[in-house]
Amino acid sequence: TPIPLMTGTDFEGISRVIEKQTGIPVFYFPTSGMHTYVKGAGMAMETIARELVPAGRKSVKERKNKQENPLKINILGATPLDFSINSTLDSIKEFLSRHFEIISTFAMGSSIEDIQRAGEADINLVISSVGVLAAKALEERFHTPYVIGTPIIGFENVLAEKLIESAWTKKSQTAYFSVLQKAHKKDTANFTTIQNAEAVSNLKKIRSLTETIEKNKVSGNVYIIGESVISQSLKAALALRYRIEATVICPLETEPEYTEKDVLLFSSEEDIKKAITDADTVIADPIYKTICSEKVNFVAMPHEAYSGRIYRKEVCDFIH
């Protein structure tokens, strides 16, 4: 709510009083009600990274045998708004555990004790825009590099390679940039078709991304509307796995560091409606279907930050 800010509430003073009386660390965030969840949740994760993670870590270059000592990783940017309460985050963890030792997840499914170990990680994976500020804070404090990208089937193995590369070079990067640059040059000959080893039968009733894309016959002039990191990772996955090019429209806050130049940044439905007049296929939360032409092949990708819990049962598992 913007009311405390409008009335000049002394957040810092209140925090000091409560902390003194209880002995519990207290933090405040200057929310104004004028931004999206990306900014608010991002500030919260950054504060956790700065205030709750003690100093002390061992450099990856001190490891004698990287096979006997798997690289340690934090997953940053996990919230129910972006990853719902379905199998996606569990699938991401299961995939990463094949290559890395997962220290903590900011901020679903990890205890305070897990998060306090975040400084031990060799590499941080930012799976949504919400985790970028925390990644920068951990890089500043512990010199831990980070990679931006969401593990999505067709793109997940490329992302794993980028994580290992950054852990050893100590250079942060946005994983989908190299994939999308090749796609722009029409140079798809060197793209690797990713084969996922997990059987679809294991999904039970969970809706898989593979099933969603193939069943809806995604083709033609494709637009993806959604959160910046997830949408661009999906764009990379479509290019790698299906040779499909897509245009991303992001209605949320985003930064040039992890946003391609051709991403369309629109906050109003009117602007988005104008941008997709030539669309053959639109991949987005179901609330956007009302602004699409009846001729458009609309592929529903529910996102709780947009439509809440209405379409939760239809949320896809990104790894399958």
Which sequence ranges carry the predicted segments?
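An N-terminal assembly and electron-transfer interface module characteristic of large anaerobic redox
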Residues: 1-320
